Amino acid sequence: MARLGEPRLATTFVLVTKTVVVTGVAGFIGSRVAARMVHEGFSVVGVDDLSSGKVANIPSTIEFVEGDLAVQGTITKLPKQCAAVLHLAGQSSGEMSFDDPVADLHKNTVSTLNLIQYAISVGVQRFVYASSMSVYGNVPDAPIAEDEHVAPLSCYGVGKLAAENYLAVFAKQLSSVNMRMFNVYGPGQDMSNLRQGMVSIYLAQALANKHIVVKGSLERFRDFIFVDDVVEAWLRAATFDGVGGSTINVGTGVRTTVAQVLETVKGHVAGTTVEVTDPTPGDQNGIYADTARLRSVLQMNEFVGLAEGVRRFSEYVKTA
């Protein structure tokens, strides 16, 4: 798979302008997507309300708009010519969505609807949306495909699914791709947020206290994907021809239990102990991706494995 600075697969999709909007640009994934788009020769306008993102994450080579996308005043600051919108802004924790469901709705659904209307008004060619595995809810112990039944368990999942449905409503006016993100981890993740990001939570606790508190069973399972692989998938979703109208699982297809994650993390922080407590509301017991569509549509066939990804992440945190 192509890495930063290496040639990537050819595409016949031609964007009429080199200007793209990346939302959530001060966040973990959005900042890296923006940097990659700049590297590929695009002019990036980045948007973030800085409620959770960090100014230090924002690439210095982009134009930055600070504001809440649920507010029309922010939308009016966006460029009148734009080829693609890569929408990664939003509240990203299922657990936290129960704290204030209305705020979660504004962050994840109202903001998306506003951006959809903006994208249509300026003739955007491609709208890429950060959806989530949370739309599926509890599923059988088998790889979950995009066309399977959806039944979200959290306010967060409901909001993500609603945004997908808004994109479906406007499908004739806007070419979009729903990226159903699985458990993304890696360098740059917010280590102070202990309510979002399983790998980052466990690694942060291990490094700080050599003690990890696990909310829920060690037999729960997930699909962990390294941030570099996610960035590559987003670039392809924005620029590949023929992918509009797709919903794509962004995972590796590898079933990994919480116990396996803990052993991997403990391998980098000797002497770490583990305490198991009650699960959080709306938490899925287990889920991992069927990646057939990711492989066929976006031609993603190689991924960073968990052991190597955690090694890179741990080294990054220890030297940061």
List the predicted regions and their residue ranges:
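Structural element of the ATP-grasp superfamily
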Residues: 115, 167, 202, 294-295
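Short beta-loop-alpha junction of Rossmann-like oxidoreductase domains
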Residues: 138-139, 187-189, 293
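Short, solvent-exposed loop/helix junctions and linker helices
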Residues: 23, 106-109, 157, 192, ...
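Conserved alpha-helical elements of sugar-nucleotide-dependent glycosyltransferases
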Residues: 29, 198, 257
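C-terminal substrate-binding subdomain of Rossmann-fold SDR/epimerase-dehydratase oxidoreductases
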Residues: 33, 207-320
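Flexible, glycine-rich phosphate/dinucleotide-binding loops
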Residues: 53, 94, 136, 185, ...
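NAD(P)-dependent short-chain dehydrogenase/reductase
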Residues: 153-155, 165-222, 227-236, 263-267
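N-terminal Rossmann-like NAD(P)+-binding domain of SDR-like oxidoreductases, especially those catalyzing
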Residues: 2, 7-182
